[in-house]
Amino acid sequence: MASSGGHWKTLAEAQKLTQSTKIPGVFEEDIKRNNPLERFPVAQAAGTGLKIEWLRESTGTEDAVTEADVGDQLVWGEDVDYTEVESTLRYMYIQRKLDRYVQNIYGTYNDYKAQVLLEMEKGLKRKIGDRIIYADTTYGGTPTQFDGLHALAAERGAPWTTSSNTNNKQNMDMASGALSLLYLRTQIDNMRYGVSEILIPAQLGIRFDAAYQERGFTYSVSSNETNHFMMLTQSVNELGRPILFFMGIPLVRTDYLVREEDGTGTGSTSNKRAKYSSTEAFSLFCVKYGNVLAREPGITYAYGGTEGEGDLYELWTWERLEDYNAGGMRMDSYGSVLLGSTLCLGRIFDITDEALVA
């Protein structure tokens, strides 16, 4: 029998009578975990005007309380003031043409319009997630951006270190060294409203796992440079599992915290926090969530410019575009990060990818 299986001259001739099967849709390969947009509380800021403004306490009344004796003349005090804070919703969009030839001539089991819409939404949400961390108008000088987490943390000024321990503990500098749990504990203790989550890059998440599972911590008093590893009691089927909490607070690994450029956007410098170009470093954030628009002191992503309640973006469609044999779609989004109290955001930056230290 011929190699074609019989009847046909060659196998290639037999294959002409068949058709390959293509599975509808697209399998995703470019995946990012834990988008901040999907973890932050979101609030619709419809009808808020040009800017959103709120007040922070600046001076208290404790020092105005005076001790007096019977018969003393009492003094009137007037010394309270506030810090006014503002934020503006910034505009982002993505738009695409959809050629009618593609839909009408190449029409198949795939819905081209639905696929384009799905990928537009993915791109918009991922861009917002990146901007929540890295957007910077204060230090980056980009007027089309709001201030993201790095910029908001840098506003605390010169960073805290063990040698500069009078600086603000909401902004800490590891000075191109391994993450010290002393720094992390100190910052968490300083966040009076508490901490909802600790956002960390995957590299630091792996270091947490290794420290508590197999490697241990570095101690200056230890002869072999490590000690106290695996301080937790675990059953056999728990060995090697990721460490998901520190001090009872979730450790959230997010792919939106990426490699960064060491020494940038520190709070002592006038530049923004830059992504990696030559000297690698990492950052983590301690965040306390809360709806600022509902007078909660936490951190919120506010959005507006949409008609429907709860709509993060507005979708515009055109059946036909001038000068094109095509229709069009656009997604619009207006948003900004709101930080109610400065005590709801902490940052540790310039961390290297090394074993954790105590």
Please give the residue ranges for each predicted region.
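Second-shell loop/turn segments in exported
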Residues: 103-110
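Sec-exported extracytoplasmic/periplasmic mature domains
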Residues: 121-129, 133
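Sequence/fold signature of self-assembling virion shell proteins
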Residues: 2-39, 55, 143-189, 193-197, ...
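Assembly/oligomerization interface modules of large self-assembling protein complexes
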Residues: 5-6, 18-96, 117, 140-147
